[in-house]
């Protein structure tokens, strides 16, 4: 390794510091000795272990890059995942304090709450449906520790899949009572509709994304467990956030959820 490149531990330290002090860093993809998927997840895992050792509580996972268009843009053929910690949760309608995030954007998603562990090497629809306690409407508030969102696959994976915060709606719905493939989504900023979509935008169905995640988590040695929250991926385009804005999301059959920014 030459002095021009850094080890995963050094990259993880840069991202961890950026998370703590709110100052973004330059992209990592040209600074890692080996800039591939395995290296990116190694960086993420280093910080996951560090945060767990510091007492942060792991409560679930998020799935990113579920749009085929975004995958093509980043030159990949699969989604990615990141960790959800308890201190990332924001109440429905709760104000997100200014300065808590660096360059936030919002996405409307279906959240699944698991009632059983998912530990099979390869899961089926039946496995997932049986394991899911209920679904909730959600807003993922994504963020990037990389300057100006100048990201490629390696950057976002290393940066915990560009995780920030998340908001869950308060109305739980059983999977038998909703069509997650056809459900329509509308997001408003104030009175203006800024994003529309449906379940098909998320790998054809949020359930497809969740099955992908369940299989990957078993291979990674961190299988999904009862009680975990799974943010299954965006149902429509993400929207940048400015101070003072309010976002209201409605997902057909699931209900509403809101995020407010100071």
Curated annotation (Swiss-Prot):
Gene3D superfamilies cross-referenced by the UniProt entry: Fumarylacetoacetase-like, C-terminal domain
Reaction catalyzed: (S)-4-hydroxy-2-oxopentanoate = (2Z)-2-hydroxypenta-2,4-dienoate + H2O
Name of a matching Pfam family: FAA_hydrolase
The family this protein is said to belong to: Belongs to the hydratase/decarboxylase family. MhpD subfamily.
GO molecular function: 2-oxopent-4-enoate hydratase activity; manganese ion binding
Originating organism: Dechloromonas aromatica (strain RCB)
Leading EC class: lyase
Involved pathway(s): Aromatic compound metabolism; 3-phenylpropanoate degradation
Gene Ontology BP terms: 3-phenylpropionate catabolic process
Cofactor(s) annotated in UniProt: a divalent metal cation
Protein task: Catalyzes the conversion of 2-hydroxypentadienoic acid (enolic form of 2-oxopent-4-enoate) to 4-hydroxy-2-ketopentanoic acid.
Name under which the protein is recorded: 2-keto-4-pentenoate hydratase 2
Annotated keywords: Aromatic hydrocarbons catabolism, Lyase
SUPFAM superfamilies reported for this sequence: FAH
GO cellular component: cytoplasm
E.C. designation(s): 4.2.1.80
């Amino acid at each position: 390794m030459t002095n021009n490149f850094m080890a995963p531990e050094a990259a993880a330290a840069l991202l961890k510091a950026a998370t703590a002090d709110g100052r973004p860093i330059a992209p990592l993809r040209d600074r890692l000795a080996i800039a591939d998927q395995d290296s990116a997840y190694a960086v993420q895992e280093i910080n996951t272990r560090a945060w767990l050792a510091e007492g942060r509580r792991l409560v679930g996972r998020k799935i990113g890059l579920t749009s085929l268009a975004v995958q093509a843009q980043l030159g990949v053929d699969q989604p990615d995942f990141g960790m959800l910690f308890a201190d990332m949760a924001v109440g429905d309608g709760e104000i997100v304090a200014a300065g808590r995030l660096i360059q936030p954007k919002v996405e409307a998603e279906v959240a699944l709450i698991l009632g059983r562990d998912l530990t099979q090497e390869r899961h089926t629809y039946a496995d997932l449906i049986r394991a899911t306690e209920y679904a909730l409407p959600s807003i993922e508030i994504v963020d990037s520790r990389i300057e100006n969102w100048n990201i490629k696959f390696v950057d976002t994976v290393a940066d915990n899949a560009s995780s920030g915060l998340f908001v869950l709606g308060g109305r739980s719905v059983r999977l038998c009572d909703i069509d997650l493939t056809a459900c329509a989504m509308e997001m408003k900023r104030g009175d203006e509709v800024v994003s529309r979509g449906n379940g098909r935008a998320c790998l054809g169905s949020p359930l497809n994304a969740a099955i992908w995640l369940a299989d990957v988590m078993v291979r990674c040695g961190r299988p999904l467990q009862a009680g975990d929250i799974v943010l299954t991926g965006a149902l429509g385009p993400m929207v940048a956030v400015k101070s003072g804005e309010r976002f209201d999301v409605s997902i057909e059959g699931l209900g509403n959820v809101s995020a407010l920014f100071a």
